Amino acid sequence: MGEALTKEEIDDLADRWYKALDVHAPVEELHAMLLDEGNEMMWPEGPTHGHKEFTGWYDRVTRIFFDEVHTLTKVDSKIDGESADVEVVVNWQAKVWNPPEPNSKWLGFDAYQTWEVVRSPDTGQAVIKRYVVDKLDPMPGSTEL
């Protein structure tokens, strides 16, 4: 049995995850925060499993959304040893441009998510095993997804 996860590790993981998404970090930086085998991500666009499918999703969305800002408003962890169920709420704002429209459009949502975080068998670090976008609440004036 390995070391139990801590709230601080999970908070740090969530913070690093959204900072990487904001800057469209190289996908390898995000892979380091995700379990590969056994990983499941439930996006509004559809599910991904493992690093390979995540990379396909990431390549698509980083070519659609820009000027992204993710602001964490809640990270509530229920830790059980080397795994944790985590409620995450993040305010996500971005722009999208649909050619040949003359202007980009603003998007703003509060995203309610559920994560399962585990300790990586390879690195010993806290990583995301399962990531579910439960609900997107649009902000006033937001374009629809």
Label the model's feature ranges.
Residues D85, K105-L145:
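Short beta-strand edge/turn micro-motifs at domain boundaries
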Residues M1-E37:
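Short, low-complexity N-terminal intrinsically disordered segments enriched in polar/charged residues
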Residues V27-G81:
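A solvent-exposed, acidic/Ser-Thr-rich amphipathic alpha-helical stretch
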Residues R63-D67, W92-L107, D137-S142:
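Short, cysteine-centered beta-strand-loop-beta hairpins and adjacent loop/turn segments enriched
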Residues W43, V88-V90, R130:
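Residue-level recognition of conserved beta-strand positions in structured domain cores
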Residues D80-W97, A111:
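A short hydrophobic beta-strand element
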Residues L34, V90-A94, V132-K135:
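Short beta-strand segments enriched in hydrophobic/aromatic residues
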Residues E9, F65-D67, L72-K74, Q125-V133:
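A broad structural signal for short, well-ordered beta-strand segments within beta-sheet-rich domains
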